Amino acid sequence: MTDSTYDVARVRTYLQGLQTRIADALGALDGTPLATDTWQRGPAERLRGGGCTRILEGGRVFERAGIGFSDVAGDALPPSASAARPQLAGRGFEALGVSLVLHPRNPYCPTVHMNVRMLIATKPGEAPVFWFGGGMDLTPVYGFEDDARHFHQTCKDALDPFGIELYPRFKQWCDEYFFLKHRNETRGIGGIFFDDFSEPGFERSFDLMQSVGDAFLHAYLPIVERRAELPYGERERDFQAYRRGRYVEFNLVFDRGTLFGLQSGGRTESILMSMPPVANWRYNWQPEPGSAEARLYSDFLVPRDWV
């Protein structure tokens, strides 16, 4: 985070285009266009700036699909952003990014999350400090090994041009980040996660972020197309709602992006669009031994080398 030469306008243009491309692809797949909610912060609010939320609820394929773009600025980095960088505490900041969470209707079709972002910390009389972050991760209710391999291979292909050491590094980071400590289980089968990234300078770091963003549809759409029409019943929907409870727990307790948004006075509707439309909890529930539900825990909710 030492190179202070950057181009926010190019990053903004890319992110807005990425949101549109993904929203158009999801709307075409579902048969229902995503609604558009453009928003702007008021002059008396803690944050300045605005954004655009693309949202689909009650669709044929997606029970909820939300893709948010935001570009906001504030007077002081929130604790979730400066905890690992105490030297930046109290600096002004600009944060822009695209974040999405898709909750399919069919329990055999996995939930997915993707985010790409840039942050700039500023202080009068000192050079700005920028960094990139992002990644994508897959959260199946019923695990399929070919889906996991495809998702991870696509992530690896997106990173390999920037160094073959990055995929294993970002995969491990993802496995460690998306972990529910109080449950002692991973949120899903992982993917890639990175933060505080500016080592190669602006151009190369921006290229990497674009490669991750551009890989998302290739990583996820083939899985949806394979699984969205599989038959299912009440048992599968009940287990889906139970597993979605874990998603809620992670997002509200651990997720850095959710905490950043809430701590900085972000737009609550956009921050919480990642929540599943239906979730439930059961006291001390255990899957039936040998069942497909049990196999999720034994074979998929543990870190594995998928490629």
Curated annotation (Swiss-Prot):
Assembly information from the UniProt record: Homodimer.
Provenance organism: Burkholderia cenocepacia (strain ATCC BAA-245 / DSM 16553 / LMG 16656 / NCTC 13227 / J2315 / CF5610) (Burkholderia cepacia (strain J2315))
Biological processes annotated in GO: protoporphyrinogen IX biosynthetic process
Lineage: Bacteria, Pseudomonadati, Pseudomonadota, Betaproteobacteria, Burkholderiales
Chief localisation class: cytoplasm
The protein, known as: Oxygen-dependent coproporphyrinogen-III oxidase
Gene of this entry: hemF
InterPro entries per the UniProt record, alphabetical: Coprogen_oxidase_aer, Coprogen_oxidase_aer_sf, Coprogen_oxidase_CS
Pfam family, one: Coprogen_oxidas
E.C. no: 1.3.3.3
Annotated catalytic residues: H113 (proton donor)
